[in-house]
């Protein structure tokens, strides 16, 4: 099967007649083309591409019917092979656009410019046949065709730019944006408060709060253990103190009457009833912060039948404090003195504090007894004793009178 040959111009035919070697090489290449066609079993199909236009010359492409040159590229239906121009050259397929097409330039341009390029392109065709027969890849064939058949000047003439540069306005806008970014980067954050990422700050804040809660809980447990440990030692010394106070008659009534705040409540009948008080105990409840308990131990007396009167204060939910006490069983003809008139002021009596839980000063009285009187009753008991002792010690000391000058010894 033979490929159709493109028509030659008269200049090309004259050149072939003048050079016998050139005609022989053309016949050899025609035979090689027929051999290649027989090898491919008719699978090659000719595709005609118009010749590329030279932008420098400004010449319109010629029609093949008018004697112009036509590029013939053989395309295999199964795989790609190098293109063979009938009688002149072998060129690679136009896989790379204008650059690949520039590599298949014929010798006509060279002849017009006075350069005998037929021999060079003939050798390139033979090399292309050899590479196709050896089973080399299409990219290698294209590379060799570019290196041997095409000059750098011709490649530059037919090559077209792939990436278009932005226009003048686009370049100005890009440079302006780049300058603004650089100025903002150098200036840094402004003085005003920026947008706050609340979630970014809440997460570490929550973790810190959890750590604080854990530390507080651990401190409470440690404090409770310390209170229990030293509470046992404290109870031991309190028992010894109570044993001694029981043997001192009128100890607690004296301490109450000498206290600067509680003494106003103890007048008349209350003082007589407190004279039968033998012991006072103040104890914390099971949990120290939930309340306390007051225990008053009495001897047999003509006023009431109780030997133990208890008043309890409890701290319940939401910080509410409630109190309740033992019901006092009064003897016939006796009862609590509700109020005491002193200096035009009405003051509740001490035993009213046991029965009336609605008094405004009830909690204040309990706090004074717990934190001041009971913690150190000796200091208030000794106030009366020290004053009595101070009055007894008050003695007039003699005053030394100086003698006259004449009676002095020489």
Swiss-Prot record:
TM helices/strands, residue ranges: none
Biased composition (Basic and acidic residues): 18-31
Gene Ontology annotations for the cellular component aspect, listed alphabetically: chromatin; nucleus
SUPFAM superfamilies for this protein: NAP-like
Pfam family, one: NAP
Organism domain of life: Eukaryota
Keyword Phosphoprotein (UniProt): yes
Modified residues (Phosphoserine): 9
Keywords: Phosphoprotein
InterPro entries: NAP-like_sf, NAP_family
A GO biological-process term: nucleosome assembly
Region (Disordered): 1-31, 46-69
GO-annotated molecular function: chromatin binding; histone binding
Family indicated by similarity: Belongs to the nucleosome assembly protein (NAP) family.
Protein name: Testis-specific Y-encoded-like protein 6
């Amino acid at each position: 099967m033979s490929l159709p040959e493109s028509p030659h111009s008269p200049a090309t035919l004259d050149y072939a007649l003048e050079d016998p070697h050139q005609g022989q090489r053309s016949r050899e290449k025609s035979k090689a083309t027929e051999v290649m066609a027989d090898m491919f079993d008719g699978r090659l199909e000719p595709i005609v591409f118009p010749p590329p236009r030279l932008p420098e010359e400004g010449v319109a492409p010629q029609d093949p019917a008018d004697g112009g040159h036509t590029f013939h590229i053989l395309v295999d239906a199964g795989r790609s092979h190098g293109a063979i121009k009938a009688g002149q050259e072998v060129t690679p397929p136009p896989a790379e656009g204008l650059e690949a097409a520039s590599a298949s330039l014929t010798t006509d341009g060279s002849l017009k410019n006075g350069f005998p390029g037929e021999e060079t392109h003939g050798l390139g065709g033979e090399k292309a046949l050899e590479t196709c027969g050896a089973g080399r890849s299409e990219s290698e064939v294209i590379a060799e065709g570019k290196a041997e058949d095409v000059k750098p000047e011709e490649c530059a003439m037919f090559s077209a730019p792939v990436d278009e540069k932005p226009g003048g306005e686009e370049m100005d806008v890009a440079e302006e944006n780049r300058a603004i970014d650089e100025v903002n980067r150098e200036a840094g954050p402004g003085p005003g408060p920026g947008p706050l990422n609340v979630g970014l700050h809440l997460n570490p804040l929550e973790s810190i709060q959890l750590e604080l809660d854990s530390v507080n809980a651990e401190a409470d447990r440690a404090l409770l253990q310390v209170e229990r440990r030293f509470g046992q030692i404290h109870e031991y010394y309190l028992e010894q103190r109570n044993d001694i106070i029981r043997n001192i008659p009128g100890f607690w009534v004296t301490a109450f009457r000498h206290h600067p705040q509680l003494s106003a409540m103890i007048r008349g009948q209350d003082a007589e009833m407190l004279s039968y008080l033998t012991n006072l105990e103040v104890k914390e409840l099971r949990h120290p912060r939930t309340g306390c308990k007051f225990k008053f131990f009495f001897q047999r007396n003509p006023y009431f039948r109780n030997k133990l009167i208890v008043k309890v204060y409890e701290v319940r939910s939401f910080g509410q404090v409630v109190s309740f006490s033992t019901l006092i069983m009064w003897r016939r003809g006796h009862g609590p003195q509700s109020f005491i008139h002193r200096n035009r002021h009405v003051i509740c009596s001490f035993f009213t504090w046991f029965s009336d839980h609605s008094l405004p000063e009830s909690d204040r009285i309990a706090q004074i007894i717990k934190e001041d009187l009971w913690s150190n009753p000796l200091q208030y008991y000794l106030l009366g004793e020290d004053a009595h002792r101070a009055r007894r010690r008050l003695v007039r000391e003699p005053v030394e009178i100086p003698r006259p000058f004449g009676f002095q010894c020489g």
